[in-house]
Amino acid sequence: MKLSVVALAALVSVAAAQGVSELPKCAQDCASKGFPSSCGADVKCVCTSNSFLDAITCCVATTCTAEEQKKTIQFAKGICGGVGVNVPDSAVCPTGGSSSSGSASSTPTSSGGSSSETGSVTGTAITGTNSPTPTSRRPSGSSTAHSSGSGSPATSTGAPTQTGNAAASVNANGGLLAAIAALVIAVA
């Protein structure tokens, strides 16, 4: 109980320093919807609640003007940044599904082969590349008219490599407006 009071006091002091008047009315309305009650006054919990973030960010993206979105994002950065959660520079409304694209190619040659795969997924900020490049040796040898020869068996060696870049964001919204909701609940 005592910890909740301390957390609430910290939230209120951060919000006061931020200035509630800087938060557009449209964002205040969005923040009052769907607040994750399981978080209580835990700002970090609110700033990382995926379902809440999707709902509030979509609300701000569709109901606030570009200028109001900018002010809302700056406000959220001040609060969520204080607990180590990064907030993106824009409000996006996640789509119901995801889309992906990719390509693959293979170019065998007499000395070996190579292949590469590239793909991306939108809506979750995850991209990656997988490029295995195996090499192989074919039998080699020589022969004469007397039918003698030498050779070596075919061998294959390869070390597939994988490189990737996954944005270390909780989701596409990254805590964008969770701070606003925490403020609205704390002040209410």
Swiss-Prot record:
- UniProt binding sites for heme: D42
Q: Which InterPro entries match?
A: CFEM_domain, Extracellular_membr_CFEM_dom
The segments labelled Disordered in the record are 95-163
Lipid modification GPI-anchor amidated asparagine sits where?
A: N165
Stretch forming the signal peptide:
1-17
Post-translational modification, as annotated = The GPI-anchor is attached to the protein in the endoplasmic reticulum and serves to target the protein to the cell surface. There, the glucosamine-inositol phospholipid moiety is cleaved off and the GPI-modified mannoprotein is covalently attached via its lipidless GPI glycan remnant to the 1,6-beta-glucan of the outer cell wall layer.
Q: Where is this protein localized, as stated in its record?
A: Secreted; Secreted, Cell wall; Cell membrane
- GO cellular component terms attached to this protein's record: extracellular region; plasma membrane; side of membrane
Q: Which UniProt keywords apply?
A: Cell membrane, Cell wall, Disulfide bond, Glycoprotein, GPI-anchor, Heme, Iron, Lipoprotein, Membrane, Metal-binding, Secreted, Signal
Q: Which family does it belong to?
A: Belongs to the RBT5 family.
Q: What is this protein called?
A: GPI-anchored hemophore ARB_01017
Q: Could you tell me which species this protein originates from?
A: Arthroderma benhamiae (strain ATCC MYA-4681 / CBS 112371) (Trichophyton mentagrophytes)
